[in-house]
Amino acid sequence: MEVIAENRKARFEYFILEEFEAGMILLSSEVKSLRERKANISDAYVTEKKGEIWLNNMHIAEYKAANQKNHKPKRERKLLLHKKEINKLIGQIKTSGITVVPLSIYFNDKGLAKTKIAIVKGKKLYDKRATIKQREWEREKSRLSKNNL
């Protein structure tokens, strides 16, 4: 599994409730650009339109060698999921306080572009502070254990 882009900000700003793996409908120039690791998903989010799941605001840079048939960098991309998963996501999207964001984009073993999306709930400021405090304490513990050896 070759990870192309990761949304590290999502793990800090949200509580992750459930994760899904989804396929994406991409143009050839987008796939070539992804192979060059030219993607950004830090501001991306998932929406629902007419019973389908769409990935919005994901930036895939234009492929340099493409001609006038190049893609738009921030176009909407359709996600491919099973019907049960789509219905579950639609129900969660309509719930207030819950959103769906991509966590990472990668190529699986068969060479297909996949995205890992998650149902998330936003953290409050004090939750973010607690996360920082916990992370710093873990670092301090590892430093102390190294020094005591």
From Swiss-Prot:
GO biological process: trans-translation
Keyword tags: Cytoplasm, RNA-binding
Described purpose of this protein according to its UniProt entry: Required for rescue of stalled ribosomes mediated by trans-translation. Binds to transfer-messenger RNA (tmRNA), required for stable association of tmRNA with ribosomes. tmRNA and SmpB together mimic tRNA shape, replacing the anticodon stem-loop with SmpB. tmRNA is encoded by the ssrA gene; the 2 termini fold to resemble tRNA(Ala) and it encodes a 'tag peptide', a short internal open reading frame. During trans-translation Ala-aminoacylated tmRNA acts like a tRNA, entering the A-site of stalled ribosomes, displacing the stalled mRNA.
Main location: cytoplasm
Protein name per the record: SsrA-binding protein
SUPFAM superfamilies: Small protein B (SmpB)
Database matches in Pfam families: SmpB
GO cellular component, one term: cytosol
Places the protein is found: Cytoplasm
InterPro entries: SmpB, SsrA-bd_prot
Gene it is expressed from: smpB
Gene Ontology molecular function, alphabetical: RNA binding
Family: Belongs to the SmpB family.
